[in-house]
């Protein structure tokens, strides 16, 4: 993985004018693609190994259930439409092992987002259009996938104030690099 929050902080320290795109929220704009498409909860269909998903949250939680052999929860996740329900079900996966999940979760999210963005040209164009900007999930509630701060708090502080890992932002930048390398 090329990105982590410490590398991002170092980039910004060396170049304080680095563009940072803060995103959070999944409500689409009916007229154009916006940064809401970066959300795990953004509703768009994509397929992985013959299975269709409608959010990367669904993909992540279904993959979590499969990783631990919980086919019942996998089925519930696949039959639910709400990403909030997917998240809730993902927390109930049987035989869950935090060590294994922590080793696999980022790769799972990268793979889901590769499918999401490569199979939806308008989303791919949006992600590629972010150029070399640092992508940051500005969720005040999430210190794993986000930075633990909302956009306003992040803008009024510095990267040193970020209290989260920003794994989603890192995953999306990884996907952007992959799309650029593949010229898809």
Label the model's feature ranges:
Residues 1-184:
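Charged, low-complexity intrinsically disordered segments
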